[in-house]
Every structure is written in C-alpha cells, then in structure tokens.
Amino acid sequence: MNPNQKILCTSATALVIGTIAVLIGIVNLGLNIGLHLKPSCNCSRSQPEATNASQTIINNYYNETNITQISNTNIQVEERASREFNNLTKGLCTINSWHIYGKDNAVRIGEDSDVLVTREPYVSCDPDECRFYALSQGTTIRGKHSNGTIHDRSQYRDLISWPLSSPPTVYNSRVECIGWSSTSCHDGRARMSICISGPNNNASAVIWYNRRPVTEINTWARNILRTQESECVCQNGVCPVVFTDGSATGPAETRIYYFKEGKILKWEPLTGTAKHIEECSCYGEQAGVTCTCRDNWQGSNRPVIQIDPVAMTHTSQYICSPVLTDNPRPNDPTVGKCNDPYPGNNNNGVKGFSYLDGGNTWLGRTISIASRSGYEMLKVPNALTDDRSKPTQGQTIVLNTDWSGYSGSFMDYWAEGECYRACFYVELIRGRPKEDKVWWTSNSIVSMCSSTEFLGQWNWPDGAKIEYFL
C-alpha cells in the first residue's frame, strides 16, 4: 500500500468512527431529554436521602443529580418553613445518676492527626442532631502555629462545630462565626450564633441567624466584651443571652439581651443581688431559663440569673448552699450566702453549671479546691434556697489526678419524653500552663446525661500522654 492509499484508509476509518460518535451523542441527548420530560417514573431504585450536592454526585449519574438536588432543596425549604419555635413546656427528668453521652479524645487523636487546637468547648442540639462546639485557634495541635495558643484572644479564633464524639479536624469542622467568645442556640426553626472579636478596648459582637449576619453590638465599657461560652436557650423564638463588659476583678457592666431571629427585642442591665457575672451556663424548663455563672471578682459561690423569656425580665442571686462550686475556693463553710459572694476565690474562677430543681438539684465542681483538676457531681437538695443544704449523693466524673477545666449545661429539647434530660460537658484541658513541656494549650471533651437509674461511675480523663508529643 503506497503512502496515498494509507492516508485515504486512515481518513476513511476516522470518518466512520466520528460518524458513530455523533450518532451515539444524538441517542444520548434524546434519552436525556426523554428522562427529563417524562411525567412519572416507576423506578425501582430508591433515591438517596443526601441533600449535599457532592454526596449526590457520588451516588448518582449526572443527569439524575440535578433532579435529586432540586427535589431535596424543595424539601429542605418546606421543612424549615413548617418547623415551629421551640417551647419549654416540660420540667426536668428525675436525676439519680449520670451516664456517658459523648467523648471526642481530641488530644489523643491529635498526636498523629490533623486535630484543631480548641478551648471553651460546649454542646448544643437542634431538631436533627447534637454537635460539639468550641473556639478554634486556627491551627492544629502538631502545627507550628500552636505555639502561644495559651492566649484567649486573637484574630485566628473562630466558633466551630463538628459531629458528636468525633475530634475537631480540618476536614469535619464547620465554622459558625469568627471570634474569641461565643454562644449558640437553636430556636426550633434556625440556629443563632454569636461571636465576639476585636481588641480588648473595642470589641464587638456579630449575631448570626440561619447562617447569615443579622445584628451587631458594640462594646459599651471598652473592656473585653464577652458572653457565655456555652449554649443559649430559646422560648417561643425569644433567645436571652448574657453579656458582660468590664473588669474581671472589679465591677463590670452585665446586660441580658433578648433576641428573636437574630434581632434585638430588648436589653436590660443586670438586676438582683449578684455582684459579678461571667460565662453563664443556661438551661430551660417550664417556660423559664436558669443560668449559673461565674463571679470572677469575689465569689466562690456561683451567681444565678433566672430569666423569664416571655416577660423579658430577670432576677439574680447566689446559690445559697455552703457547697461552694467555683475554683479556686476555700473549704466548704457551714452556712452559705444567698445574696452576697462568699470570699476566697482570689480574683479568679472557672466556668461551671448546676441544675437547680428543688429536691432534684445537682451541682458540678472540680474536686480540687486550688486547681482545675478532677470533677464531681453532687446532689444538693434545695441548694438554691437553703443556706445549710448539704450533699446527699455524688458521682465522680474525672479523678482528681486528671485535669479538667470549664464545664457547662446543655439539653436536647427535641428528644422524645415527658421531661427534659439534664446533660453537661467537662472540658479536659491539656498543655500549658500546667504541662509546659509542650508549646500548645488545647482540650478534649467528655459529656454526660442524666439517668433515672442508679448507675455505676468511672473515671473519664483526657487520656493523652504528653511525652508522646515531645
């Protein structure tokens, strides 16, 4: 075959292949048009429930992806529109003991994985799920930028959330808002998240609702505007949030803001007998919200704010019981104080919580009176009102030989049942300042929920070995 014949043969073959490709394309186009215009489909294969576009692409051919995506978007919009504001209609369940709810082992896993440096963690639920929350430091435990993460406030912190009992990684964390102080809660329709950022003398809060910024609040005392560091609570769409601006070791200006869909309905200055308020841990029941806070100025006993979200009013006092629950603190006295701080905290403190329910009252505190180590739950009937109330029952959560930290309350208000199950978390701080062989400060989380059974207890430490990081 001479060269001209070879060229003719090759051209003819290419022409035939091209014609076949065009015909296949026409047939494929016709099939696609037919599938899109077909009024109904008795498909035997069920559509996946994924609402995320990337998940849908994995599970479907491209021409089906568009159909599924549009359908799921409609479902999401309809579900959000049909959801009602949550109403706090139930009381607390009887609490006889505490069972394990979640544990993320973040520091242990972070020894060889991309786990984010965090602090100030908490738990918050919505109608679909409960998630862990924390303030990230914008770096991983093993990253070089983890040097200096002992500091609370920087431009690199943000509020993140991630699946319950998983460690917070660069792959599974969702940024809720940017800042170094936060709170977040779901009203039944959508989530409100608040983040505070900026320099100490000029910080501001941005209020996000349904993942969009809605309102801003500027500093009023120019001294580290700050908020709860755990979840807020909503009643029929009204979500009270406690803010403080001012000295941590002297008088400060505390305000209670009432939000609805991220917008301010009202705010009022602190009233009642509490002298200093920081880092409130709140829960809701019977249409009211109760917040147990930190008096960093004078009190080893904890101040309490009781909020009526319907009337948008509040009052405050101290837990009357002589069972002191801040840290540091003196030994428990014989008689407590209801309207004044009990001295002995040396201008210091730690975030904490309680469930104040008459004879069903439980208080949480570190076991150590001098450092953030150990954690225990104590049943102290009528602790809010009885200045001689004593523990009648207890449960150790973390042994005193292991580090603890902040703690706070949360509840799943959408769980089935005739009452709300009380829950709490404990921050397990590792690294600096106590473990100064490493350059970072981070934490893991353990969380517990109440049981009507009398369950056994166990130690739930962080469990990471610092020498593995050296």
Swiss-Prot record:
Record topology, Intravirion segments: 1-14
Annotated catalysed reactions: Hydrolysis of alpha-(2->3)-, alpha-(2->6)-, alpha-(2->8)- glycosidic linkages of terminal sialic acid residues in oligosaccharides, glycoproteins, glycolipids, colominic acid and synthetic substrates
Disulphide-bonded residues: C93-C419, C125-C130, C177-C195, C185-C232, C234-C239, C280-C293, C282-C291, C320-C338, C423-C449
Biological processes per GO annotation: carbohydrate metabolic process; viral budding from plasma membrane
Pfam families membership: Neur (PF00064)
Virion surface side: 36-470
GO MF annotations in UniProt: exo-alpha-sialidase activity; metal ion binding
Cofactor requirements of the protein: Ca(2+)
Residue segments, region Involved in apical transport and lipid raft association: 11-33
Active site residues per record: D152, Y406
Protein's membrane topology: Single-pass type II membrane protein
Domain of life the protein comes from: Viruses
Residues annotated to bind substrate: R119, R153, E278, E279, R294, R372
Modifications after synthesis and translation: N-glycosylated.
Residues that carry a glycan: N42, N52, N63, N66, N87, N147, N202
Signal peptide: none
Keywords: Calcium, Disulfide bond, Glycoprotein, Glycosidase, Host cell membrane, Host membrane, Hydrolase, Membrane, Metal-binding, Signal-anchor, Transmembrane, Transmembrane helix, Virion
Membrane spanning stretches: 15-35
Regulation: Inhibited by the neuraminidase inhibitors zanamivir (Relenza) and oseltamivir (Tamiflu). These drugs interfere with the release of progeny virus from infected cells and are effective against all influenza strains. Resistance to neuraminidase inhibitors is quite rare.
Annotated Gene Ontology cellular component terms: host cell plasma membrane; membrane; virion membrane
Comment text on domains: Intact N-terminus is essential for virion morphogenesis. Possesses two apical sorting signals, one in the ectodomain, which is likely to be a glycan, and the other in the transmembrane domain. The transmembrane domain also plays a role in lipid raft association.
Biological role: Catalyzes the removal of terminal sialic acid residues from viral and cellular glycoconjugates. Cleaves off the terminal sialic acids on the glycosylated HA during virus budding to facilitate virus release. Additionally helps virus spread through the circulation by further removing sialic acids from the cell surface. These cleavages prevent self-aggregation and ensure the efficient spread of the progeny virus from cell to cell. Otherwise, infection would be limited to one round of replication.
Name the record gives this protein: Neuraminidase
Taxonomic source organism: Influenza A virus (strain A/Whale/Maine/1/1984 H13N9)
